[in-house]
């Protein structure tokens, strides 16, 4: 694999993880308020 492909994969996975974390946080906050 080319280095650029590896970097792109790492960046994509990081973005996915961050999005999942933000969604989980929002869900937890909204559930906690109810």
Curated annotation (Swiss-Prot):
The chain crosses the membrane at residues 9-29. It is found in: Cellular thylakoid membrane. One of its GO terms (biological process) is photosynthesis. This is Photosystem I reaction center subunit XII. Belongs to the PsaM family. Disulfide bonds: none annotated. It is a single-pass membrane protein. InterPro entries: PSI_PsaM (IPR010010). Keywords: Membrane, Photosynthesis, Photosystem I, Thylakoid, Transmembrane, Transmembrane helix. GO terms for cellular component: photosystem I; plasma membrane-derived thylakoid membrane.
């Amino acid at each position: 694999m080319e280095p650029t492909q590896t970097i792109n994969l790492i960046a994509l996975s990081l973005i996915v993880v961050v999005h999942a974390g933000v969604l989980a946080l929002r869900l937890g906050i909204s559930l906690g308020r109810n």
